[in-house]
Amino acid sequence: MIVLVAGANGRLGGLLVALLLGRGHTVRGLVRRQDEAGALEEIGAAAVVGDLRGDIEWAVDGCDAAIFAAGARHRAQLEAIDGGGAAKLAEAADRFGLRRFVLCSAVGAGAPERRQGPLRDFLAAKHHAERRLEHLDMPWTILRFGRLTDATGTGRISTVVPPGTPVTLSRDDAALAVAEALDRDRLARRVVHVIGGDRHVADALDAVEPAPLPPVYNSGLGAGQADNPPPDPEMLLPDASPLDADVDYEGEGPLPPELVGNDDPAPGIP
């Protein structure tokens, strides 16, 4: 497949590009600046330069699949990038009839209104993107990751979030989960939690039988579409997000790299 990866110059995105190339895919890496293109081209990917806040339909044209692994690097940019940027890429993919779309989201995005503190903004932006996907016809998959780490991957995950327990996931295993999900049509229109665990990634994803993404809650983050929507599994978790532990995120400065997609090493967008 020809796969577009948004956020290809981040730590997660870079691992994903290399993994997809190794599996025989043709990869387009969407980056913000021309000087970020060289590293992708050196490993055999095609680099395309664009801003997720602007017109990006041209980047999707000719692709078979797209992956959103990008993220804002400052709190003030969260809604424009993690929310609106992801939704914009998904809508472009839908218009061009792409076969697959994978959104890298986060544990806690199913019910951000229940969270306290600064992580709520991050999760609310992810929630916005997830809800926009619900209205699209293409076969999308949402992967909600635990707190990302640089630990060596084990190739094993869990798709069940234990209540009240901080959850983590290595970037290696996050990238592997995305690559495996991309090849599984049965995960179309499914939301899957992915955290560190003890099952091989392929086996864990093959065993997933989640409910489709529920309608939006009347929570101030969007208007519901059903009188009694089925609850998102995260509504059953304790109020404290498993993502909260060990994440230092305050103020308007740079976001911590533990947050999904917010690990781009390049300077912040003006």
What are these regions (language model features)?
Residues M1-H25:
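N-terminal Rossmann NAD(P)H-binding glycine-rich loop of SDR-like oxidoreductase domains
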Residues I2, D64-A65, R100:
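Structural motif
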Residues I2, N9, D172-P270:
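Mid/C-terminal beta-alpha module of Rossmann-like enzyme folds, strongest
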Residues L4, R28, V48, T141:
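Conserved beta-strand positions in the Rossmann-like core of class I SAM-dependent methyltransferases
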Residues G29-K88, A92-R95:
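NAD(P)H-binding glycine-rich loop region in Rossmannoid oxidoreductase-like domains
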